[in-house]
Design a protein with these regions (language model features):
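Sec-dependent bacterial lipoprotein signal peptides
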Residues: 2-33
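Bacterial Sec signal peptide processing site at the extreme N-terminus
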Residues: 30-50
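Sequence-level preference for short, compositionally simple segments enriched
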Residues: 40-42, 80, 86, 165, ...
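Low-complexity, acidic/polar, glycine-enriched regions of mature
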Residues: 54, 74-75, 79, 91, ...
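Tryptophan-anchored aromatic micro-motifs
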Residues: 55-67
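A charged, solvent-exposed segment within the mature domains of Sec-exported extracytoplasmic proteins
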Residues: 135-186
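Glycine-rich, aromatic-bearing surface loops/beta-hairpins
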Residues: 164-215
Length: 215
């Protein structure tokens, strides 16, 4: 897998530094209180269309996304070209990013379908160079939820943040991604992404990643 550019994390690292004091105070105030789960993915079993992760991301697709801080302020925008190659139950997904400040970055996910549990949830595991350990989660209905820790470089130290990542398929060619970013169990921001694939993306792919659009 290709190694994601370290500079890609600098913006999120700066945000975490700004939030660190607030987070520390809140963490002390909330010490001993367990965070509640966001939702039970099993409750989405009847939602349609059914998401098959490796099939949705096989081939060429594009995405548009934003990052907001915990107060809902827009901090960054980005666009992505994606290319997925499917080999049995394994998907290798290449992502190429352009951010609105001109920064370029890349990530390669290796995603394995592990099987289906007795509850009907299809289990997945994903690995990428900048993800600590492996992303773990499941799919049912039109939704996937997986969680993972990403290590960010800050002042020469590695700082872990947690991602609670949800994907909801809307129709054959559209899915919406919401990822909640937290530190010490306290949410510090969120990512929203719209994925476009298939015929809907045919007139868009590849997006220009030379520079951010000016008009």
């Amino acid at each position: 897998m290709r190694r994601t550019h370290r500079r890609k994390h600098s913006w999120l690292g700066r945000l975490i530094v700004k939030c660190f004091v607030v987070v520390s105070v809140l963490a002390g105030a909330l010490f001993g209180i367990s965070a509640c789960a966001r939702k039970d993915i099993g409750a989405l079993s009847g939602n349609q269309p059914r998401l098959v992760l490796e099939e949705f991301f096989a081939g060429k697709s594009v995405a548009y996304g934003i990052f907001e801080d915990r107060f809902g302020n827009l901090r960054r925008q980005f666009r992505v070209n994606l290319n997925g190659n499917l080999d049995g139950n394994r998907l290798v997904l290449d992502e190429e990013f352009l951010y609105d400040d001109g920064e370029r970055a890349s990530r390669t996910w290796t995603i394995d379908r592990l099987g289906t549990g007795t509850n009907g949830i299809v289990m997945y595991q994903g690995r990428a160079a900048d993800v600590a350990m492996a992303a773990q989660g499941g799919q049912i209905g039109n939704a996937l939820n997986w969680q993972y820790d990403m290590t960010l470089e800050m002042s020469g130290m590695g700082v872990d943040v947690h991602f609670d990542d949800w994907i909801y398929q809307q129709d054959e060619d559209i899915a919406i991604n919401r990822a909640y970013v937290s530190k010490f169990g306290i949410e510090i921001g969120s990512v929203t992404i719209v994925f476009i694939r298939g015929d809907t993306a045919s007139d868009l792919w590849p997006l220009s990643l030379d520079q951010w659009p000016n008009s």
